[in-house]
Amino acid sequence: LLVVTGNGKGKSTAAFGMAARALGHGMKVGVVQFIKNRTDTGEEAFLGQHAEWHVTGDGFTWDTQNRAQDIATAERGWAIAARMLADPSYRLVVLDELTYLLSYGYLDSDVVLDALTHRPSMQHVVVTGRAAPAALVELADTVSEIADVKHAFRAGVKAQAGIDL
């Protein structure tokens, strides 16, 4: 279990790099994006041809207008992830931005941690997102924290196709 967390840019990018590496070795890869609701990203356009890819978010924000809807959306995404985590044919599962759903209580942490603990022994999982909960960090084999040293967005540079999405 690898956790890529922190306030810096590149958490999802690091996970998708691992997905590309696994695919290059002929491994079956599954990706569940829990927050993002875009389906026009470069990573999905390319990796989605080779991996099972699910964009399950509805773009909700932390200042939600409908918590019940956000929880239902999270649970739909988790159902897909749980299926992958129970299937030994998946050698790598990327759970992109899962940390937010745990931190905000959109998913039951005990259920998620149990699924991660009892997944097939040869299955690798990458979890991304800011503020990884302590229990997830404790369970992980590897935790990387990406720092926000400087970001072009603060200088007014918008996300660019091929670089940021």
Task: Annotate each language-model stretch with its function.
Residues 33, 55, 97, 129-130:
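Short secondary-structure boundary segments
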